[in-house]
A protein has these predicted regions:
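Metal-ion/cofactor- or nucleotide/acyl-coenzyme-handling active-site neighborhoods
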Residues: 1-212
Length: 212
């Protein structure tokens, strides 16, 4: 029996996306799971930024710890390899001094949270991060700091589930200025074109170039 995975971003979820999430055998959400209200239900993984302010905010929030998606998830994926981010600290101090706490590592805190909550904690290895950087280079991205957690999670899902049908919902490819969202959209579109991914746009009347 073929399994269906849906990766759920925090952008707008349309009817098609909500239906895909409801029909999925495995659902991956992100960070604060902000799109959960529009697509409640199954959650197997919450992928988190385990460095910097997002990590600190989630770990210090009872709202996050008791969020229904976080409660249900069997696994937490930390998308930022501690060794990779330790290596970024010195160059970023020069190029982006305003990101002084960006590489602060909270992996051990997520480890403790998962241990207490009976969840598996998976740290996505830097080889995945570096594979994403290499794939994005094809699209000549503007200078960026790191790929988005969504792009890391998509690539990690490919590696873990090589033959499984994977759909995307709630991906707007927009947000923090130092993620390479334009190149990420092009990369995702290339995966869709070769049949590796399916996109469930928020508005099915939009063309693929404008959709989620």
């Amino acid at each position: 029996v073929s399994r269906k995975i849906t990766i759920v971003g925090n952008g707008e979820i349309g009817e098609e996306g909500a239906a895909a999430i409801a029909a999925a055998d495995f659902v991956i959400r992100f960070n604060e799971c902000r799109s959960y209200a529009a697509s409640p239900g199954r959650t197997d993984v919450v992928a988190v930024c385990n460095t910097g302010r997002p990590a600190k905010a989630m770990l210090s929030s009872d709202t996050w710890r008791t969020h229904p998606a976080v409660m249900e998830a069997k696994e937490i994926w930390s998308v930022r390899d501690p060794e990779k981010f330790a290596g970024l600290r010195a160059p970023l101090a020069v190029s982006h001094p305003e990101l002084g706490d960006f590489c602060d590592d909270y992996t051990s805190h997520f480890n403790a949270f998962c241990k207490d909550a009976g969840k598996e904690h998976i740290v996505v290895e830097k080889v995945i991060h570096e594979a994403v950087d290499a794939a994005l280079a094809t699209f000549d991205p503007a200078p960026y700091v790191v790929p988005s957690s969504g792009m890391i999670a998509i690539t990690a899902t490919f590696r873990r589930f090589p033959e499984v049908e994977i759909g995307l919902a709630g991906f707007s490819h927009s947000g923090w200025e130092w993620h390479p969202f334009a190149a990420e959209r092009q990369l995702v579109d290339s995966y869709i074109a070769n049949g590796r991914l399916t996109r469930h746009p928020a508005d099915t009347s939009l063309s693929s170039s404008q959709g989620a």
